[in-house]
A protein has these predicted regions:
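Short beta-strand segments within Ig-like beta-sandwich modules, predominantly Fibronectin type-III
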Residues: 83-92, 185-191, 214-220
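Conserved structural position at the C-terminal beta-strand
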Residues: 113, 242-244
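Helical hinge/lid and interdomain linker segments adjacent to catalytic or ligand-binding clefts
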Residues: 276-376
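A glycine-rich, often tryptophan-bearing local segment used as a flexible ligand/cofactor-contacting loop or short
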Residues: 338-428
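Bacterial Sec-dependent N-terminal signal peptides
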Residues: 14-48, 119, 509
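Catalytic beta-strand/loop cores that center a nucleophilic Ser/Cys/Thr
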Residues: 397-471, 476-483
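Surface-exposed, short loops/turns at beta-strand junctions within beta-sandwich domains
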Residues: 97-106, 227-234
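Solvent-exposed loop/turn segments flanking beta-strands in beta-repeat/beta-sandwich domains
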Residues: 63-79, 161-186
Length: 509
């Protein structure tokens, strides 16, 4: 009985084993289905007069029947493999390219979804955009252009834009006097760059035409580029234009200015705004010529009223851009003779505009009437004036006066004595230099009182001094105030001592 049961159990187990070995899944494995893609707008119908700009906002979406969309690929114009770009976005702003030389064009945009298995929509969604190219725009920056007249350093600033977007701008070019063959491309250093600023350093080696090195930006970066066509002692015209990717060109912008040839390494800055300005300039040039010094001249006597701190605004004869333009322009000379009718004029900008000039070992002679200034005036940190001589208001003192035939003597006691010859001047004020040895000339003066009384002044009477560095002399009485028949020789002797012997003025050009 047990034997029979054992046989039946073994037989049942064997049958189950056979059945288990033959069990399997029936049917076919489903293949991956490709995703689908749709554009928000799939057709644009407009007439030619209303064509779109090349800057367009495009959006799309996709779905996948058996998985999910992992991203998208898009192509512009050319949909052959290798021209598709991947993105996970479903919208973006595109600048669609118009073929060079074409004003209007239908540009194809196609997009296809990519699913989680890397399969692409075989029938990508596409649309043709009817486009019209917009011309780029060039605008001059009036604050970054040369003044009416310059010598060999000048700067130019302009802005570029394009209604189709800055990335469509291909180039911007400049020319000097010649718009047929003189164009030079200026580097655009960033895709979103709108403002351009260049400086030119014009060589005078050519007899008739000047060639300039071009420098980029406010930090004066060398480009190894040059532009030619400059004409000395004549009006010159700067031209600038911008071209886009479709080769459309902006309206040409231009600026005209007079270019002077530098003839000397000595510059006269005429800051005399008085009615005698021209007479003073002629007198000064004649005196310099008599001691062998030729000169160039910049007239900075313009400007009406007073701006910040009671100081006249910086002369319009100077470039608006101080650094690098004005700093480098003034540093082209080795010596400057600065004559002025007031200490409230352009001399107040000298520390800033002459920084490169002094770095290049330049020397300055400044000639203006010495008038008392507030002790907080920054000008006193520039001129060789430690302080102005004080007066005793409790006694009714109110100032000083010099008058005809009063002596202006060398502080050392040795040298030429000058005689004042400009009538009565109650505006003069003596000062104290930083060091007693820095004093160069002292004046015979009267002290004035509010009562109208006068008394001879016996105190410190310095009216001319040199700074401790030895590169700046301030002479506090205008040289023309010593002019008299036969006095020219004395004035020239003083200038010989101060300009040539002290400051090293010489003419080498």
């Amino acid at each position: 009985m047990q034997h029979t049961f054992r046989l039946l159990l073994i037989s049942a187990m064997a049958a189950l084993a056979v059945i288990g070995c033959e069990t399997s899944l029936d049917g076919n494995l489903n293949e991956n289905q490709t995703p689908n893609t749709s554009l928000t707008i799939d057709n644009i119908e407009i007439d030619d007069g209303n064509r779109l700009s090349s800057r367009v906002n495009i959006s799309w979406w996709g779905d996948d029947p058996d998985g999910y969309v992992d991203g998208y690929e898009y192509a512009i114009s050319d949909t052959t493999e290798g021209n598709w770009r991947f993105t996970t976005r479903t919208d973006s702003v595109f600048i669609l390219p118009i073929s060079p030389g074409e004003e209007i064009e239908d540009v194809l945009f196609a997009v296809r979804a990519i699913d989680n298995e890397g399969a692409a929509d075989p029938s990508a969604a596409s649309i043709e955009f009817p486009l019209r190219n917009s011309d780029p725009v060039t605008e001059l920056n009036t604050l970054e252009l040369p003044p009416d007249t310059t010598f060999t350093i000048a700067s130019f600033g302009w802005a570029i834009s394009d209604p189709d977007g800055l990335p469509t701008v291909r180039s911007t070019e400049i020319a000097i006097n010649d718009t047929l063959n003189g164009w030079v491309e200026i580097p655009i250093e960033a895709e979103d760059q709108q403002e351009l600023f260049i400086s030119v350093d014009i060589s005078q080696e050519g007899a008739d035409e000047g060639v300039a090195d071009i420098y980029l930006g406010r930090n004066y970066r060398d480009t190894e580029l040059q532009v030619s066509g400059f004409e000395f002692d004549q009006l010159n015209t700067f031209y600038v234009r911008t071209t886009d990717a479709a080769l459309a060109t902006s309206e040409i912008q231009s600026h005209e200015w007079y270019l002077k040839r530098q003839t000397s390494n000595v510059l006269i800055l005429n800051d005399d705004a008085s009615s005698s300005s021209l007479e003073n300039l002629v007198f000064t040039r004649d005196r310099l010529s008599a001691i062998g010094i030729s000169s160039d001249v910049i007239d900075i006597s313009d400007g009406e009223g007073f701006g910040s701190g009671g100081v006249v605004p910086l002369s319009n004869a100077f470039p608006r851009i101080i650094n690098p333009t004005l700093n480098r322009a003034l540093a082209e000379w080795d010596h400057i003779y600065w004559m002025s009718s007031s200490l409230r004029r352009n001399i107040n900008y000298a520390p800033e505009i002459l920084s490169r000039f002094f770095d290049n070992n330049g020397t300055l002679f400044f000639n203006a009437l010495s008038r008392v200034q507030d002790s907080s005036n920054p000008l006193l940190n520039f001129l060789p004036i430690q302080a102005y001589v004080s007066i005793d208001a409790s006694r009714g003192e109110n100032g000083f006066r010099i008058q005809n035939n009063y002596e202006v003597r060398p502080a050392s006691g040795q040298g030429t004595v000058l005689l004042y010859n400009a009538g009565r001047n109650t505006g003069i004020w003596p000062f104290v230099p930083f060091d007693e040895e820095d004093a160069l000339y002292e004046a015979e003066l009267l002290k004035t009182f509010i009562t109208g009384n006068l008394e001879r002044y016996e105190g410190p009477s310095t009216v001319a001094a040199i700074n401790p560095e030895g590169n700046l002399i301030f002479f506090g009485i205008p040289m023309i105030d010593f002019m008299d028949n036969g006095a020219e020789g004395d004035i020239e002797a003083v200038l010989q001592e101060l300009l040539i012997n002290r400051l090293g003025f010489s003419t080498q050009q």
